[in-house]
Amino acid sequence: MPDAQLGDKDLDDEYITDAWLVDQHVGNVLFSWGDNYAGCLGDGTTTDRSSPVQVGTLVNWKQVSAGYQYSVAIKNDGTLWSWGWNFFGQLGHGDTANRGSPVQVGSDSNWKQISIGYRTSLAIKTNGTLWGWGENDGGALGLGDTANRSNPVQVGTETNWKSVFSSGYYAWAIKNDGTLWSLGGFNNQGQLAQGDTTFRSSPVQVGSLTNWRHISEGMAIKTDGTLWAWGANSQGQLGLGDTVDRSSPVQVGTLTNWKNISAYGSTCQAIKTDGTLWAWGANSQGQLGLGDRTNRSSPVQVGTLSNWKQVGIGVQFTMAIKNDGTLWAWGGGFINNGQLGLGNTVNYSSPVQVGSLTNWKQVAGGDSHTLAITYREI
């Protein structure tokens, strides 16, 4: 199992604001598909789905994040909901019982952003506080220890956290002042970007810069549009043209037009400000979308289109949304449970459209399941 952030989850601010609700007549509908172990699709069953299935009847979903056989989401009212596998308490309900349908986490209504990786959950509230729960084997919750938590626990006392990215065995976050922090976790390949391979279980600042804007697994974009990478690199996932690990951030090329990135395990997908999509890293199942299964150690453009809006990576598969609201999928995984949503269990090495809808808003890939939000008139 790759030690990776499961799904996207690493949205820019423009994707996690109330601007999603264009007006009072538009609602956000949640769909899921793929592997349904422990009810992680949230449809009240454990039946795998190879095509999108609506989760309940509500139209107030704001952001979703998919992990290892579990799911977490935020509604427009700021409440937090989770479902699926819960062996490590990763659902945040104070127990280890699985849930087959969405259940509210506590009673707070001020959750802003959620990022779950493998079996570790991290979230930020509107007051800028950071919270963690679930598996903590590597100290990735940033709580100063390696004890699991089954309820959300505040990370430190700071109230200036802006965004967070959980990769399961390590995590990072950006503060409002633009500083980048590694929260903790295993660091045997320099994943914490501290210039060493020392294990940590509490937040430590990465360098001294104050211009970090967007974070994913071992990848980050600065406010100047430059892309930086660090950590494991056995599959060329750092995009530096080699397979050498890095324990400190290194710039990827010289371009200054990177907009957002989704890195998962050993695969990376990124969108530039011109709307083009670029991929690199592991490609054993065609997850780079380049028409083959050859790894790449430098960014390569996916097709020739310039209308990509958001991309989310799961385990050996990729989901992406275009500006026209269409949803596309490729890859599939060593085991394909229908996570591409194409009505079959076939792997694809080039983008294939999922259905015919043109109202997809956000997509998140997990271990072998996918969550996505559409909007519709209500």
Where are these regions (language model features)?
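Enriched but not universal
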Residues: 1-27, 31, 375-378
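Blade-level signature of beta-propeller repeat domains, shared across WD40, Kelch, NHL, RCC1
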Residues: 347, 363-378
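Tandem repeat domain/solenoid detector
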Residues: 59-63, 76-79, 88, 101, ...
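Surface loop/turn motifs at the tips and blade-to-blade linkers of beta-strand repeat domains
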Residues: 55-56, 105-106, 155-156, 206-207, ...
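Conserved core positions of repeat-based scaffolds
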Residues: 32, 70-73, 82, 120-123, ...
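Short glycine/serine- and acidic-residue-enriched loop/turn motifs that recur at repeat junctions
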Residues: 31-50, 84-101, 134-151, 183-201, ...
